[in-house]
């Protein structure tokens, strides 16, 4: 089974429905193969908390979080994070701390990270990426 982990930006586009190509690709994949990291969940909820969004968007975020499988941050993800961060620092590669955590979580979960963020492509080998 191929598992796809949506990063925060892709999850936001899914919720907003503003990029048809993402929606088309998403509906072609069984929902039980689509996951997000608990880090992405936290980022989505933070985004709602810091701004006064219309109630409709808040409802859509919560509906999305009910429907998608959310993988908890665990020991395996933390182990991969430590190794990945050390390798990136040694190679002079910088990524935001939360992006680094999401990348590590996708690797630990043996998932393909779905992203449109080119920063993830700088990560040394081991992270599988798809741009939807």
Segments (PLM) and residue ranges:
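Generic structural signal for small/hydrophobic residues in well-ordered secondary structure
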Residues: 7-8, 22, 44, 81, ...
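Acidic, PIN/NYN-like endoribonuclease modules and their adjacent C-terminal/linker elements
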Residues: 1-3, 103, 107-132
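Active-site neighborhoods of divalent-metal-dependent phosphate/nucleic-acid chemistry enzymes
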Residues: 68-114
């Amino acid at each position: 089974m191929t598992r796809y982990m949506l990063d925060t930006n892709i999850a936001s586009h899914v919720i907003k429905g503003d990029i048809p190509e993402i929606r088309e690709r998403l509906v072609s994949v069984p929902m039980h193969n689509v996951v997000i990291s608990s880090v992405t969940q936290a980022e989505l909820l933070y985004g709602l908390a810091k701004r006064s969004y219309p109630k409709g968007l808040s409802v859509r975020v919560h509906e999305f979080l009910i429907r998608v499988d959310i993988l908890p941050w665990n020991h395996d993800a933390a182990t991969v994070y430590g190794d990945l961060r050390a390798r990136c620092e040694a190679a002079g590669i910088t990524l935001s701390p939360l992006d680094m955590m999401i990348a590590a979580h996708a690797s630990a979960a043996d998932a393909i990270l779905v992203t449109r963020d080119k920063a993830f492509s700088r990560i040394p080998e081991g992270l599988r990426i798809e741009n939807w």
